[in-house]
Design a protein with these regions (language model features):
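N-terminal signal peptide c-region/cleavage motif recognized by signal peptidases
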Residues: 3-5
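N-terminal secretory-pathway/extracellular module detecting exported/lumenal segments
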Residues: 7-70, 74-132
Length: 132
């Protein structure tokens, strides 16, 4: 699978979330094959902006400096569902505060404009990479 990236210089804003802003790491966009299926994979960083959420999150053990989440998203070939290959809470230096693991339960992305945009952006990046 893909390694946990350092906080990349290649973050592109995909949109707002309930508690922050989602950025995709354009350098991490790739295709992967898992269990016989192909996925569009990329790391994304959700930078938390909701102060109430941050205050609550920082109550946890080793979470005092948490500022964002780094997540490995794997979208199906249609872009309507994704699974989470890895999920980490990190501090401002990119150090892992918590490893939240993977979630292989498919999530419907059709009604989430930010996730649909993230998929579309990643797909365009992959298309550009393939032309180089």
């Amino acid at each position: 699978m893909l390694p946990l990236p350092t906080l990349a210089q290649s973050l592109l804003e995909a949109g707002k979330t309930d508690v922050g802003v989602l950025y995709i790491d354009s350098e991490s966009v790739n295709t992967v094959k898992k269990d016989g299926k192909y996925y569009l994979a990329f790391f994304a960083e959700e930078k938390y902006t909701d102060q109430t959420f941050l205050a609550s999150l920082r109550q946890g053990e080793d979470m005092q400096n948490a500022v964002s989440a780094i997540t490995l998203y794997l979208f199906n070939t249609f872009g309507n569902e994704y699974i989470i290959g890895a999920n980490y809470i990190v501090d401002s230096e990119g150090k892992v505060c918590a490893d939240l693991g993977a979630d292989m339960t498919p999530v419907d992305a059709r009604n989430n404009a930010t996730m649909r945009n993230a998929y579309t952006m990643a797909l365009k990046i992959l298309q550009r990479k393939s032309k180089q």
